[in-house]
From Swiss-Prot:
In the presence of other necessary color factors, this glycosylation reaction allows the accumulation of anthocyanin pigments. May be involved in glycosylation of unstable cyanohydrins to produce stable cyanoglucosides. It comes from Manihot esculenta (Cassava). One of its GO terms (molecular function) is anthocyanidin 3-O-glucosyltransferase activity. This is Anthocyanidin 3-O-glucosyltransferase 6. The gene is GT6. It comes from the Eukaryota. An anthocyanidin binds at A307.
């Protein structure tokens, strides 16, 4: 169950209240409030008991936040239920999106009754917050952010304060396996390598791995491929490394591609995206990975797996024109095998050196860095947040 850990969080309320009470008792400072992840909204009760406001740090994009508010609103006002759209070809008109949203990219967990209602409870908690910090920036998601600001339903103040990324000290974080990867990249020409990496819970079994291998070999592009074992079906666990990658890959693949590619297990994603040899990124479209790829000006080919990643892929490809599609509505539980031809097509497209998408990603990369500078958009919203937190104390 995707939501089994929420019960565990709920059980920590008494402990959190005790810890915070002790902390404030020994300090001359007053408690300004709580900052909560959306899945920790059970801690709202603790904030209320302590008589302080709470704020949400939303780690996905503004378009998805707007989608959540829309879903909860039509449920509460019209008794609409997203589960009716399972396996549907319908399209939804969502205020935070400029284009109609295909039902096929809805998060799978929201198409199951009990999980859908758990989401509704969470979103109601978001509406009661004093403010919501979103890990995005105005120049990236202006339509979504403006729609949230103009929404007539009860939505708290929104603060686009991103991109918030962990970028520093990468040379100290990569470890021995990472160092070997970076040394290999040092020998590759600029923007010549396509990087395939699918997040902490992304992995593939032998059948899909063979199609990816075939696509890479056919594409004739240099590649760095982080290939990991998928979590057990139905389990929310991180991927693990294969003991022997050669048992998963086609016979002779490593020998035939020895001069053009490297297959590894775990890989230090940020340090790799930062490397000048990387020219494209086949990604699961986790929001952090999207922000990292934009920051380092690396275009994405979308291959979402779980959570809201299909929605993110739609946002990047259709809404923003910042990515190419391999498969926008792929879901890891579907057991569909993507063909080598489809994967190869996406790789060739994302690696085009003078494409419009590459140009747009470079422009957005510059904007993402500028947004964090003094007096620019995200800096402005961070200042506004601090002012509002101080004002809410009185």
């Amino acid at each position: 169950d995707d939501f089994k850990d929420l019960g565990f969080i709920d059980k920590q309320k008494a402990h959190v209240k005790e810890a915070v009470s002790k902390l404030t008792a020994r300090s001359d400072s007053s408690l300004a409030g709580f900052v909560l992840d959306m899945f920790c909204t059970s801690m709202i009760d603790v904030a209320k008991e302590l008589g302080v406001p709470y704020y949400i740090f939303f780690t996905s994009g503004a378009a998805f936040l707007g989608f959540l508010f829309y879903v909860q609103l039509i449920h509460d006002e019209q008794d609409a239920d997203l589960t009716q759209f399972k396996d549907s070809d319908a399209e939804l008109s969502v205020p935070s999106l400029a284009n109609s949203l295909p039902a096929r990219v809805l998060p799978a967990s929201m198409l199951v009754k009990d999980r859908f209602y758990a989401f509704i409870r969470i979103i109601r908690g978001l509406r009661e917050a004093k403010g919501i910090m979103v890990n995005t920036f105005m120049e990236l998601e202006s339509h979504a952010l403006n729609s949230l600001k103009d929404d007539q339903s009860k939505i708290p103040p929104i603060y686009p304060v991103g991109p918030i990324l962990k970028l520093s000290n990468q040379e100290n974080d990569v470890g021995p396996e990472g160092s070997e990867i970076i040394e290999w990249l040092d020998d590759q020409p600029p923007s010549s390598v396509v990087f395939l990496c699918f997040g902490s819970m992304g992995g593939f079994d032998m059948d899909q791995a063979k199609e990816i291998a075939c696509a890479l070999e056919q594409s004739r592009h240099r590649f760095l491929w982080s290939l990991r074992r998928p979590p057990p079906k139905g389990k929310i666990e991180t991927s693990t490394d294969y003991e022997n990658l050669q048992e998963i890959l086609p016979v002779g693949f490593s020998e035939r591609t020895a001069g053009m590619g490297k297959v590894v297990g775990w890989a230090p994603q940020v340090a790799i995206l930062e490397h000048p040899a990387i020219g494209g990124f086949v990604s699961h479209c986790g929001w952090n990975s999207i922000l990292e790829s934009i920051w380092f000006s690396v275009p994405i080919a979308t291959w979402p797996l779980y959570a809201e990643q299909q929605f993110n892929a739609f946002t990047m490809v259709t809404e923003l024109g910042l990515a190419v599609e391999i498969k926008m509505d792929y879901k890891k539980e579907s057991e569909i095998i993507l063909s080598a031809d489809d994967i190869e097509r996406g790789i060739k497209c994302v690696m085009e050196h003078h494409s419009e998408i590459r140009k747009r990603v470079k422009e957005m990369s510059d904007k993402s860095r500028k947004a964090l500078m003094d007096d620019e958009s995200s800096s402005f919203w961070l200042d506004r947040l601090i002012e509002d937190v101080i004002n809410n104390l009185s």
